């Protein structure tokens, strides 16, 4: 067993809450998508409020349907990219496992990314169904996974901004 400093937990124990959060995000994302797939037809719109609708669409590209019009290679490209990014974020989560904000951010991104990877593998595209609009202007439809990824990136940025405020400022360099 590796030597642990006083008050330090084993890596798996320290990462467990964040891994559970990632799994919960992925599970909730997939549950909501299964409900939508079971109850809606492709392209069907269910108005909820004057600015929010449920609409079932399939996104073969990335954010904002980037590369969606291509022949299908992007399915495997975005799947591979998500797997690589999740691996990198797991390594960062391990590195920052005793913190709170960064591992939570990484967990949200990982859970969302895996949720969308599952879609690409099962459906060949990501299932989107949340649509916000104002009059004729609308935001592209998205899903819970996309929301978790966005929230995770926002938390990462916030953590970095907070960390920058706590660093002592370096004085001017003096020539030797």
Curated annotation (Swiss-Prot):
Record's GO cellular component, any one? Answer: plasma membrane
Which GO molecular function annotation, any one, does this entry have?
aspartic-type endopeptidase activity
Lineage of source species: Bacteria, Pseudomonadati, Pseudomonadota, Betaproteobacteria, Rhodocyclales
Broad EC category? hydrolase
Q: Does the keyword NADP apply?
A: no
Q: Where is the active site?
A: 128, 146
Q: Which PROSITE patterns match?
A: SPASE_II (PS00855)
EC numbers: 3.4.23.36
Q: How does it sit in the membrane?
A: Multi-pass membrane protein
Q: Name one Pfam family in it.
A: Peptidase_A8
Keyword Nucleus applies: no
The pathway that the record names for this protein is: Protein modification; lipoprotein biosynthesis (signal peptide cleavage)
Q: Which UniProt keywords apply?
A: Aspartyl protease, Cell inner membrane, Cell membrane, Hydrolase, Membrane, Protease, Transmembrane, Transmembrane helix
What the entry lists under HAMAP family is as follows: LspA
Where located? Cell inner membrane
Report the sequence similarity comment from the record. Answer: Belongs to the peptidase A8 family.
Q: In the UniProt record, what gene is named as encoding this protein?
A: lspA
Known function: This protein specifically catalyzes the removal of signal peptides from prolipoproteins.
A Gene Ontology biological process in which this protein takes part is: proteolysis
The protein's name is Lipoprotein signal peptidase
PANTHER family according to UniProt: LIPOPROTEIN SIGNAL PEPTIDASE
Catalytic activity annotation: Release of signal peptides from bacterial membrane prolipoproteins. Hydrolyzes -Xaa-Yaa-Zaa-|-(S,diacylglyceryl)Cys-, in which Xaa is hydrophobic (preferably Leu), and Yaa (Ala or Ser) and Zaa (Gly or Ala) have small, neutral side chains
Where would you find the membrane-spanning parts of this chain? 11-31, 38-58, 76-96, 101-121, 139-159
């Amino acid at each position: 067993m590796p030597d642990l400093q006083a008050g330090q937990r084993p890596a798996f124990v320290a990462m467990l809450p964040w891994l559970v959060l990632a799994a919960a995000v992925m599970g909730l994302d997939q549950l909501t998508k299964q409900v939508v797939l079971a109850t809606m037809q492709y392209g069907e719109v269910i108005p909820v409020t004057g600015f929010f609708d449920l609409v079932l669409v399939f996104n073969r590209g990335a954010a904002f349907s980037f590369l969606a019009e291509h022949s299908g290679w992007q399915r495997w490209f975005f799947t591979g990219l998500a797997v690589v990014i999740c691996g990198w974020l797991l390594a960062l989560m391990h590195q920052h496992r005793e913190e709170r904000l960064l591992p939570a951010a990484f967990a949200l991104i990982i859970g969302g990314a895996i949720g969308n990877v599952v879609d690409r593998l099962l459906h060949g595209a990501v299932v989107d169904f949340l649509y916000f609009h104002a009059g004729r202007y609308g935001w592209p439809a998205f899903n819970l996974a996309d929301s978790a990824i966005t929230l995770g990136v926002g938390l990462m940025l916030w953590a970095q901004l907070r960390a920058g405020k706590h660093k002592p400022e370096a004085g001017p360099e003096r020539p030797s």
